[in-house]
């Protein structure tokens, strides 16, 4: 006692908080010093002390103890600001959806993490005795993230599929959640409750399986005599010191350790804390230690390979059941992992990248050649360095050197000024850690309907060559050009009869109808894409009008382009300049097969001028087409008037339209008849008024197509023979039949006084026929009824125009009947007769009676983008006709530039070219663009581009141009300018299509500087207009759009746009036609413009843009759909495939452990392992040559996979704050990796192919038979491993009892009863502890005889030298692959 008192005086006084870890340390040191019994007394006193203090504290918890962190407000605000900027960038097309999602998640994750770190200091400063603070940081159950949710913010949540919801929960539980936040957080809560119930049972089951695998592993020897080890290296800072110490303490060295010439530790010495400290301070060579992996036995383990027992700190005793301890050590924390999930409920955890920050202000410099530009995963521009990059930062007085590791992103440019603590580089997270990653597909859907373009080449994936899946080779934009497609508000009707040839694409379009029940005249819009065309077309002949069905689709649109062009139709268009026929599909010459034709015919006058109410285009509806001859009769809808008035019905609603056109709104009737016309001399084989059947011979080579009554009329020089089909009735005397042409009788009217009373289902035509004077009979003929729809005024359908106050162009659809009433129609053989023609009539300014505009100029315009040519039909309304104000030869009339330098002065010198006049002329040039053609052979289609899809932008600052041209001319005084700046009045319809080309003329002295394009020498020669497309080519469009121009005898030169680069210092952006412009791009001086789109019209002071939405896509993305295809809202546009780290599963720990142990997670383990091991094997093959390389490769594969598995399992537990010693995991992993699968070839006499055998057993058998066994390393899950042991009794007691016992009986298996479980089942003594001695006596004689063969040892030594002592080689090629940041850096095993 006195001794104790004396010692107490010398004791050190510790004044610090003792938490869980400190208690552990204290206890282990007490055991070391005082032994077990004494320690338990001390701990008893500590327990009493603790309870007394806790009672005295009487801690309580109220809601007021939860203090919100003050800095939260501005942190959240800052994060919101960042997401807003991000949203904008996404809208402008600078980042794509995946990058946006990633970045917003990281922004919020960082915010939430920062709040979490603020929490502890905040409590410590404001209220250190706050019960929440005391409890949460005392080491009691629970963790910081729960407190963080109470007082910080809940942050990001996962949805049930484990995907991130990118809407964070900004409130904490103390402030209360909003409704949305509550619903989002319910995902996690529900999952937490369910998981707690499910996982508790799972954890128990996990323990059971683990114990099953390793129950037979007992310490049976002191030393197995192995010479292998696993090397652990403290150097290069790859492994944190804490983990390094944990790995080494309690292990046994496999090799002597030298420090220079001096040996500081010998083989088989166990490592204590002192030795570890020496290793750390000296930083010696890698330390080779013995682990359960290196032990040479199959079914047991030796003391030295196991190391110290964690219970008492000495080497493990013989006979200890280390297997069962290992299984329980891993399974037991599983229950804790489970319960943890409940509290955090689905809060997202994910790694963010590490940043390198600048140490001080200054200029940054690095070698440009070592980096290449790239995109970060957030879509920011950055430089990627492939090797170590040395960066210097020059501040005023000091140079800082920073080394940036390879594979990092450099976020600044060379010679850029950086501020202190600015992020200059981002180290890629996950170069060393093989964290669980998965590949995810994300689909991006189109937000609007329109036409798809892309701005780069697109590869076809080889397996999808014929489909619409394309891969992007480089980062580019996809554009959806706005424009609706044709939709009908009626239920789709089929235009096809059985076995018609039909146009495939038109049926596709019919699927997209929107059906609407209330149908009135405005909604009666059809989409007609069809054809009845069946005549043969010879290859060399141009298809003619009679054979092509001209269609204009009656849609609610003011802009359409159907078509496909090819050589034939081009010729056709050129031949009839004033008409433009657009076949929807052309004849494919290669296949020599007939394709159906249908098209819209657009008719323009030769001079390009349309008057009011003139027909712009027409369409022959195939439903109003007849093959046979007949008579047209008009009717009204009033049924009674037909019966009462036996005479003709009065005309209604006929409007004289273009002399020949009569518009009818009522139904009209077509009475078919067969007509044959013969020359006078021919002999007719039937009599007048006789009845004939079908297919009767009429003349020599003619047969009748229908049966009925024959009428023969002889006219001058020809005979006309008609056959009327129908019934013949002989009326009674009371019937009065009109003596004139005939009566139409509506359906449902019964003629009772006919001989047979009969109700007619359809309209019939009753005609009186008088063969002789007294006798007559009545022919009742079938009638085909047609209803003509009312013309729709399309003006109401145009959206309000953005380009001017209102859209003053109107299109009306008018149907008119081509033939007059009662007119007989003669059809010539094999052609069809069009009864009704549908026209598109152009009108404007109907509201203003006194409008001055009488004519509109029309022209075709092509806009080409990336080889896809769209033709637009352009209609300009001209407010006033332009006439020359002076004579042509009067020089003062056209001299725009006079001697005076003042611009305003000479702008007014020419009234025609005066600037004000041009401005006025442009501003009064109101027009609508209509897209029309598409020179793309694949897809005929109709698109509507209304004026609301375009917008005008401007004005540009055009003042510079005058001066520059003037100055350039001053240098060369010989030039006499006749006409300078400004468009030519004569080509008015193209005034808007000169982009920045101004026509200027002069003597050809400066020809070298300008591009000479066109010489117009004769009068009335055609001037072509040229357009630039996106790639800067100049197009000469189709000749049908040329305009005849009464030009002067002048030389015209085009100014090439390079000219501007030479002369204009302050030039505006040169905008070419068809170019795509992103939102927020500065074009003119008055700031950025607000919409993105494609340039359609370039004018002197403004441009018109068709609005479009850009979507960014990165390489490897899959694009759905074809170039130029029409997409609808919600169609899939792009699919991105991206890797994301698996979001920490809501149940964080247990499922992961189970997945790893059951070797179930297919992606992560096997992918990474294969990648790593491929690399190894390559190198080894190079070093050792093929046969040895493969042999060692197999062993290395196993070793490598073992180490990787251990690290994975440890990572899961460490992330939960659970400490498990590596050796427990190693014992388990050793069991699941110790089996191999026998391959087909070789050794069939010992093992069956596909049999699972132990690795060591295979090696031994091979040595005994002096023959090699072919096998493949295999990872078994713990369930399979427990069903593949040497004891069938233990297998049967685990699972599938009947199956296992039956199999064992069939094979005649023997159970050697080596494990615990078999003996328990049978009731024998279990071979552990005291009961294991019996087994030892038998095997004593084999104790330490290593199996030796000279060859093998020689080989092992050599290989060891090559592999593991060639330091340079090792470090360069292999170590890079296997160092693992947070875990042990195991190196392959040493054989020395």
UniProtKB/Swiss-Prot annotation:
EC number in record: 2.7.7.6
Note describing how the cofactor binds: Binds 1 Zn(2+) ion per subunit.
Localization of this protein: Plastid, Chloroplast
Keyword line: Chloroplast, DNA-directed RNA polymerase, Metal-binding, Nucleotidyltransferase, Plastid, Transcription, Transferase, Zinc
One biological process term in Gene Ontology: DNA-templated transcription
Gene3D superfamilies: 1.10.132.30, 1.10.150.390, 1.10.1790.20, RNA polymerase Rpb1, domain 3
GO cellular component: chloroplast; DNA-directed RNA polymerase complex; mitochondrion
The keyword Metal-binding appears for this protein: yes
MF term (GO), any: DNA-directed RNA polymerase activity
Pfam families: RNA_pol_Rpb1_4, RNA_pol_Rpb1_5
Reaction catalysed by this enzyme: RNA(n) + a ribonucleoside 5'-triphosphate = RNA(n+1) + diphosphate
Residues annotated for Zn(2+) binding in this entry: 224, 295, 302, 305
Superkingdom to which the source organism belongs: Eukaryota
Swiss-Prot/TrEMBL cofactor(s): Zn(2+)
Keyword Ligase tagged: no
Function according to Swiss-Prot or TrEMBL: DNA-dependent RNA polymerase catalyzes the transcription of DNA into RNA using the four ribonucleoside triphosphates as substrates.
UniProt similarity note: Belongs to the RNA polymerase beta' chain family. RpoC2 subfamily.
Oligomer status and interactors: In plastids the minimal PEP RNA polymerase catalytic core is composed of four subunits: alpha, beta, beta', and beta''. When a (nuclear-encoded) sigma factor is associated with the core the holoenzyme is formed, which can initiate transcription.
Name of the protein this chain belongs to: DNA-directed RNA polymerase subunit beta''
Taxon lineage: Eukaryota, Viridiplantae, Streptophyta, Embryophyta, Tracheophyta
């Amino acid at each position: 006692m006195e001794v104790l008192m004396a010692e107490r005086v010398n004791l050190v006084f510790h004044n610090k908080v003792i938490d869980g870890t400190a208690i552990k340390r204290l206890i282990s040191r007490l055991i070391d010093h005082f032994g077990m019994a004494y320690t338990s007394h001390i701990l008893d006193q500590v327990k009493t002390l603790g309870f007394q203090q806790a009672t005295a504290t009487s801690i309580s918890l109220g809601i007021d103890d939860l203090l919100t962190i003050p800095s939260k407000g501005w942190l959240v605000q800052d994060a919101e600001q960042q997401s807003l900027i991000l949203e904008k960038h996404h809208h402008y097309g600078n980042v794509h959806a995946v990058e946006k999602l990633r970045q917003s998640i990281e922004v919020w994750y960082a915010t939430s993490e920062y709040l979490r770190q603020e929490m502890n200091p905040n409590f410590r400063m404001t209220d250190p005795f706050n019960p929440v603070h005391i409890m949460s940081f005392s080491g009691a159950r629970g963790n910081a993230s729960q407190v963080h949710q109470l007082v910080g913010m809940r942050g990001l949540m996962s949805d049930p599929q484990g995907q991130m919801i990118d809407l964070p929960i900004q409130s904490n539980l103390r402030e209360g959640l909003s409704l949305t936040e509550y619903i989002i957080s319910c995902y996690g809560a529900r999952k937490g409750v369910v998981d707690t119930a499910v996982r508790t049972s799972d954890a128990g089951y996990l323990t059971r399986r683990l114990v099953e695998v390793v129950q037979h592993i007992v310490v049976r020897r002191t030393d197995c005599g192995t010479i292998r080890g696993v090397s652990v290296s403290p150097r290069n800072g790859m492994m944190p010191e804490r983990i390094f110490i944990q790995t080494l303490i309690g292990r046994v060295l496999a090799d002597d350790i030298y420090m220079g010439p001096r040996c500081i530790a010998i083989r088989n010495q166990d490592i204590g804390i002192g030795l570890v400290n020496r290793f750390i301070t000296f930083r010696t060579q890698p330390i080779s230690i013995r682990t359960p992996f290196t032990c040479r036995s199959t079914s047991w383990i030796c003391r030295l390979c196991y190391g110290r027992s964690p219970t008492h700190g000495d080497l493990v005793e013989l006979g200890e059941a280390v297997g069962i301890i290992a299984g329980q050590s891993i399974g037991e924390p599983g229950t804790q992992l489970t319960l943890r999930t409940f509290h955090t409920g689905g809060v997202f955890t994910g790694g963010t990248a590490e940043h390198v920050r600048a140490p001080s202000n200054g200029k940054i410099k690095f070698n440009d050649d070592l980096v290449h530009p790239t995109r970060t995963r957030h879509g920011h521009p950055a430089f990627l360095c492939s090797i170590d990059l040395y960066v210097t930062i020059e501040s005023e007085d000091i140079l800082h050197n920073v080394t940036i590791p390879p594979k990092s992103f450099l976020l600044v440019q060379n010679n850029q000024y950086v501020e202190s603590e600015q992020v200059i580089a981002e180290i890629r997270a996950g170069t060393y850690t093989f964290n669980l990653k998965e590949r995810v597909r994300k689909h991006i859907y189109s937000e609007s309907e329109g036409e798809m373009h892309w701005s780069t080449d697109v590869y076809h994936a080889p397996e999808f060559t014929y489909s619409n899946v394309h891969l992007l080779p480089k980062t580019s934009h996809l554009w959806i050009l706005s424009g609706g497609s044709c939709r009908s508000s009626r239920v789709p009707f089929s235009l096809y009869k059985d076995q018609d040839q039909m146009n495939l694409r038109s049926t596709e379009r019919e699927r997209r109808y929107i059906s609407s029940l209330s149908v009135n005249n405005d909604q009666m819009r059809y989409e007609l894409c069809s054809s009845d065309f069946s005549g043969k077309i010879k290859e060399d002949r141009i298809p003619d009008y009679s054979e092509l069905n001209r269609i204009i689709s009656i849609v609610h649109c003011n802009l359409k382009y159907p078509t496909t062009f090819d050589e034939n139709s081009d010729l056709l268009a050129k031949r009839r300049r004033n008409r433009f026929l657009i076949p929807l599909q052309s004849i494919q010459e290669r296949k020599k097969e007939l394709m159906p034709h249908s098209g819209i015919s657009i008719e323009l006058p030769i001079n390009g001028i349309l008057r009011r109410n003139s027909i712009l285009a027409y369409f022959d509806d195939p439903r109003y087409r007849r093959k046979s001859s007949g008579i047209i009769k008009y009717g009204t809808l009033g049924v009674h008037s037909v019966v009462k008035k036996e005479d003709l019905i009065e005309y209604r609603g006929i409007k004289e339209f273009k002399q020949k056109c009569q518009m009818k709104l009522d139904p009209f009737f077509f009475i078919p008849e067969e007509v044959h016309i013969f020359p006078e001399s021919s002999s007719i084989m039937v009599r007048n008024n006789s009845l004939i059947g079908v297919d009767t011979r009429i003349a020599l080579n003619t047969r009748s197509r229908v049966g009925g009554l024959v009428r023969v009329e002889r006219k001058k020089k020809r005979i006309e023979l008609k056959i009327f089909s129908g019934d013949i009735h002989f009326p009674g005397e009371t019937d009065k039949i009109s003596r004139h042409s005939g009566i139409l009788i509506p359906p449902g009217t019964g003629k009772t006084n006919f001989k047979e009373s009969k109700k007619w289902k359809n309209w019939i035509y009753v005609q009186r026929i008088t063969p002789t004077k007294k006798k007559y009979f009545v022919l009742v003929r079938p009638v085909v009824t047609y209803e003509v729809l009312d013309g729709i005024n399309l003006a109401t359908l145009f959206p309000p125009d953005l380009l001017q106050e209102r859209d003053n162009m109107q299109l009306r659809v008018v149907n008119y009947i081509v033939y007059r009433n009662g007119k007989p129609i003669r059809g010539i053989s094999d052609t069809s007769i069009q009864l009704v023609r549908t026209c598109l009539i152009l009108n404007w300014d109907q509201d203003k009676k006194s409008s001055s505009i009488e004519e509109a100029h029309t022209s075709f315009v092509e806009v080409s983008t990336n080889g896809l040519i769209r033709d637009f039909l352009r209609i300009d309304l001209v407010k006033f006709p332009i006439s020359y104000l002076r004579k042509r030869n009067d020089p003062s009339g056209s001299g725009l530039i006079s001697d005076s330098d003042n611009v305003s002065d000479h702008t007014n010198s020419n009234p025609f070219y005066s600037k004000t006049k041009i401005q006025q002329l442009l501003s009064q040039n109101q027009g609508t663009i209509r897209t029309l053609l598409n020179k793309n052979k694949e897809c005929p289609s109709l698109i509507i581009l209304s004026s609301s899809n375009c917008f005008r932008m401007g004005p540009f600052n055009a003042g510079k141009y005058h001066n520059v041209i003037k100055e350039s001319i001053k240098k060369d005084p010989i030039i006499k300018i006749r006409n300078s700046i400004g468009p030519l009045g004569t080509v008015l319809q193209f005034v808007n299509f000169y982009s920045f080309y101004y026509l200027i003329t002069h003597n050809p002295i400066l020809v070298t500087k300008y591009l000479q394009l066109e010489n117009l020498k004769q009068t009335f020669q055609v001037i072509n207009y040229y357009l630039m497309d996106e790639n800067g080519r100049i197009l000469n469009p189709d000749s049908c759009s040329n305009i005849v121009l009464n030009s002067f005898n002048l030389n015209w030169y085009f100014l090439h746009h390079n000219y501007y680069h030479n002369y204009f210092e302050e030039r505006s952006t040169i905008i070419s036609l068809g170019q795509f412009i992103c939102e927020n791009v500065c074009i003119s001086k008055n700031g950025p413009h607000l919409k993105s789109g494609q340039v359609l019209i370039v004018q002197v002071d403004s441009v018109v843009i068709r609005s479009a939405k850009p979507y960014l896509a990165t390489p490897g993305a899959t694009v759905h759909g074809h170039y130029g295809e029409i997409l609808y809202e919600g169609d899939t546009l792009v699919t991105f495939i991206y890797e994301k780290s698996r979001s920490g599963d809501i149940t964080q720990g247990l499922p992961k452990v189970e997945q790893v142990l059951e070797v179930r997670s297919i992606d992560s383990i096997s992918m990474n392992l294969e990648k790593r091991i491929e690399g190894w094997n390559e190198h080894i093959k190079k070093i050792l040559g093929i046969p040895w390389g493969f042999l060692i490769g197999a062993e290395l594969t196993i070793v490598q996979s073992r180490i990787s598995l251990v690290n994975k399992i440890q990572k899961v537990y460490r992330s939960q704050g659970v400490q498990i010693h590596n050796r427990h995991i190693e014992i388990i992993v050793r069991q699941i990796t110790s089996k191999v699968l026998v391959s087909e070839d070789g050794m069939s006499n010992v093992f069956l192919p596909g049999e699972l055998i132990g690795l060591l057993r295979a090696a031994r058998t091979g040595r005994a038979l002096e023959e090699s066994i072919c096998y493949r390393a295999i990872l078994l899950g713990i369930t399979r491993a427990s069903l593949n042991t040497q004891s069938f009794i233990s297998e049967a007691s685990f699972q599938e009892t009947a199956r296992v016992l039956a199999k064992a009986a069939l094979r005649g298996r023997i159970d050697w009863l080596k494990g615990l479980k078999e003996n328990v089942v049978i009731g024998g003594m279990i071979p552990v502890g005291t009961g294991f001695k019996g087994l030892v006596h038998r095997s004593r004689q084999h104790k330490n005889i290593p199996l030796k063969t000279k060859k093998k040892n020689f080989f092992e030594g050599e290989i060891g030298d090559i592999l593991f002592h060639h330091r340079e080689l090792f470090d360069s090629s292999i170590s890079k692959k296997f160092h693992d940041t947070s875990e042990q850096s195991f190196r392959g095993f040493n054989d020395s």
